[in-house]
């Protein structure tokens, strides 16, 4: 048994000793069968939340009403959830109620896809009542039971299906895809925040190029912020190297570019992204437009962008063109290292010094003068030393006076 499961085995065994069933469930079991890195390990049990809390000395009640208790075991927190069935769903988002049951199969039946409805006991024996292993072998995303019913219960499952295409490289089962097409309008019931969470995982997946066109093919894009008229653009997005992008702002910048979005800020705000991501994605796009090719970087542009953003610009450009970005990154690192200053804060003079030198009241001219100074320093026209900057500034003033 793999270490993540071994570390949590004590919880399973303790529940078993008290006469309850307990199993590893969900994504961790799926990823074990796929040979993927195993994330959070979740446990399902026949024990009721109160019974779980009575057995373990260190627990946190994070949602016992819905069956979930966090058990802290050997310094690690694990979600332990009572077997349950879901009542009717309200607004195609969440069940109005849950009913605790003593049957593992009943619990697995309520899950979204067969690959996520697999359990494993303390001995490593797989319990798979809905054909999840077969779906994994065939690399198919298939719902547990009737696809229409699953998507009507929780419309976000349709986005999850396409997100799993991006993460796993699986295909949608025919009936699953048909049901998404039929139920796509239900996505309008889902909050933007939940859709954005799925979209970010989709964009970060190694198979994003396969998943993005599916948003158009299934009609989901009609109900996603800013994508209603972007079906053909989403299909073209399959040509780009999405896995090359490591940062979320790079992915959103590429999406804006791929979709032909003219104004990135309103588009990204519609997704309710953090301002920091919106600002940085916009800055990447603006710099990409200002520097039309890797060889076009000036010292001033590199200084203003900073190394991190400059590298982001080139990786987005590479994702668009398919050309390797490493040579550009190496060259930008070399050039940035050679800049005499890396930030405006490193300039040997500030506004107060400039005002003292010129002897004029403060005003917009101070910023204009400081901008001229850092540009001269960055371009090698003057060394970043107070005395040399003073001499350069006096000479500049004399030249300007002559030209007036």
From Swiss-Prot:
Catalytic activity annotation: a tRNA precursor + 2 CTP + ATP = a tRNA with a 3' CCA end + 3 diphosphate; a tRNA with a 3' CCA end + 2 CTP + ATP = a tRNA with a 3' CCACCA end + 3 diphosphate
UniProt keyword S-adenosyl-L-methionine present: no
Binding site for CTP: 27, 30, 111, 154, 157, 160, 163
Cofactor annotation: Mg(2+)
Swiss-Prot/TrEMBL GO biological process terms: RNA repair; tRNA 3'-terminal CCA addition
Keywords: ATP-binding, Magnesium, Metal-binding, Nucleotide-binding, Nucleotidyltransferase, RNA repair, RNA-binding, Transferase, tRNA processing
Enzyme class at the top of the EC tree: transferase
GO MF assignments: ATP binding; CCA tRNA nucleotidyltransferase activity; magnesium ion binding; tRNA binding
UniProt binding sites for Mg(2+): 40, 42
Pfam families per the UniProt record, alphabetical: PolyA_pol (PF01743), PolyA_pol_RNAbd (PF12627), tRNA_NucTran2_2 (PF13735)
EC number, UniProt record: 2.7.7.72
Segments traversing the membrane: none
InterPro entries, alphabetized: Bact_CCA-adding_enz_type3_sf, CCA-adding_enz_C, CCA-adding_enz_firmicutes, NT_sf, PolA_pol_head_dom, PolyA_RNA-bd
Tagged with keyword DNA-binding: no
Residues reported in the UniProt entry to bind ATP: 27, 30, 111, 154, 157, 160, 163
Subunit structure of this chain's protein: Homodimer.
Note: A single active site specifically recognizes both ATP and CTP and is responsible for their addition.
Stated family: Belongs to the tRNA nucleotidyltransferase/poly(A) polymerase family. Bacterial CCA-adding enzyme type 3 subfamily.
Function as written in the Swiss-Prot or TrEMBL entry: Catalyzes the addition and repair of the essential 3'-terminal CCA sequence in tRNAs without using a nucleic acid template. Adds these three nucleotides in the order of C, C, and A to the tRNA nucleotide-73, using CTP and ATP as substrates and producing inorganic pyrophosphate. tRNA 3'-terminal CCA addition is required both for tRNA processing and repair. Also involved in tRNA surveillance by mediating tandem CCA addition to generate a CCACCA at the 3' terminus of unstable tRNAs. While stable tRNAs receive only 3'-terminal CCA, unstable tRNAs are marked with CCACCA and rapidly degraded.
Designated name of the protein: CCA-adding enzyme
Organism: Geobacillus thermodenitrificans (strain NG80-2)
